[in-house]
Amino acid sequence: IAYGFGDGGGGVNRDMLEQRRRLDRIPGLPHVKTSTAGEYFRKLKETVKDTDQYVNTWDGELYLEYHRGTYTSQGYNKRMNRKMELLYRRAEWMTVMQGLMAGSLEKAEQESLTKGWKLILTNQFHDIIPGSSIHEVYEDCHKDYAAIEEIAVQVEEDFTENTALPEENTWTVWNASAWTKDELISIPCTENGYFTDDKGCVLPVQKGENAVYVKAEQVPAMGHKVIFFHPQAQGKEEQNSFVIRGREIETPYYLISLNDYGQMTRLYDKTFGREVLAEGERGNVLQMFEDKPLDNDAWDIDIYYQQKMREITELTAFEVTECGPLKLTIHMEWKYMRSFISQDMSL
């Protein structure tokens, strides 16, 4: 029999242990031996190993099949928590890089980031991040996340200002990841011309409405790459990398088919030569579920929730908003009751 304060991890206290000892002196009650969880499970293992009786085996994930709603309740907090974790990891890297470039890590500003991290950790409290706190808590959370983000953005702006090259028409592309990768970046530029890397190789570009997409290739891990813009009367003619035939789309990597509801009926991977979707299955299926559990509306999703599911099929807009050598974007909108859902599918 397990006893003690479980919620909060307090365990047993002196009074509980004394009460257990006194129970041994009450006539008629079975004698109970105090032990530990580790000792209990060691004996249980020996008992199960030596028994000839059938022992039930749990097959699957070991978790309490309860309070499933905490995985999705208050989605804003969950999204901002992860977004800020990643943002602060990048901001910390920037402060270290800036300190190294200045010749001293003592110049790496950490005080403001420490303040922000403490706010992030505060909002990871076990009743805040699951979405099970009272309304006023989440009003405070919005203010906290705004302050958290402001700190990191200021660090990024300081880093950019102190590391930017002074030469005109020159950009530095930083890669905070731990692996080398290609980056598709947006540069505010409306002039005609072309871009090159530091070796003079011409980079792929795509003109947007008020900016240019540039593919910076092989940006080193935890490092940077410099790209240059060369103005000229006429930029290099763009070659489209995408083919669109109604709801059939071909990219350099995929063949995609969409139905009249905006759902994928085919996704073929050209690189590996395989169908991603099983026969008869669909992708990009938007679903709505009734959220009225019997108890604990912020905590629970009842096991029968899938019986009250509706697909969103009223597609009201389908438009190609970007199409060029580097990027294709399809904008779709749906209507469901009094709600509107918009989606940009970028390939």
Language model features by range: what are they?
Residues 1-165, 174-176, 198:
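Active-site and substrate-binding clefts of carbohydrate-active enzymes
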Residues 107-114, 122-347:
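Catalytic and substrate-binding regions of extracellular carbohydrate-active enzymes
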